[in-house]
């Protein structure tokens, strides 16, 4: 515990918090180009092949982003839109690719939560 005199000489430093999605630079989304599209395995106790992409953003950052939904058309040099949001069982994956924007197509035959996966309304 500092004395009053010490507080007069050295004022308290504010604790600066770090961003959970630094590469977005306070923007809601960022555009980027896929440099590598691959699958990876989640940490214990889960088991799957999660689809992820390495993306170079327009801001110069190189990030790993998750590709949500069933099936995708992404490959190297695809232009994608990135939003924040981590994947809890994939360490280091702190961003999501927005489906249905730019080169990423929406999920086929998706009936519920369509807006989250860029799926169009089905024909009656």
Curated annotation (Swiss-Prot):
Alphabetically ordered keywords of this record: Chloroplast, Plastid, Ribonucleoprotein, Ribosomal protein, RNA-binding, rRNA-binding
Localization per record: Plastid, Chloroplast
Any single Pfam family the record assigns to this protein: Ribosom_S12_S23
UniProt-listed Gene3D superfamilies: Nucleic acid-binding proteins
GO cellular component terms given for this protein: chloroplast; small ribosomal subunit
InterPro entries the UniProt entry points to: NA-bd_OB-fold, Ribosomal_uS12, Ribosomal_uS12_bac
Any GO BP: translation
Source taxon at top rank: Eukaryota
Family: Belongs to the universal ribosomal protein uS12 family.
Protein name: Small ribosomal subunit protein uS12c
Organism for this UniProt entry: Cyanidium caldarium (Red alga)
């Amino acid at each position: 515990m500092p004395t009053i005199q010490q507080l007069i000489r050295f004022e308290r430093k504010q604790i600066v918090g770090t961003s959970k999605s630094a590469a977005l630079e306070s923007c809601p989304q960022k555009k980027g180009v896929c440099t590598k599209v691959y699958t990876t395995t989640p940490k214990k106790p889960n088991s799957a092949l999660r689809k992820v992409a390495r993306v170079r953003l327009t801001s110069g950052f190189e990030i790993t982003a998750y590709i949500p939904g069933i099936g995708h058309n992404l490959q190297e040099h695809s232009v994608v839109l990135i939003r924040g949001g981590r994947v809890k069982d994939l360490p280091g994956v702190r961003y999501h690719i927005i489906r249905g924007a730019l080169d990423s197509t929406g999920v086929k035959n998706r009936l519920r939560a369509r807006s989250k996966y860029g799926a169009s309304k089905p024909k009656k």
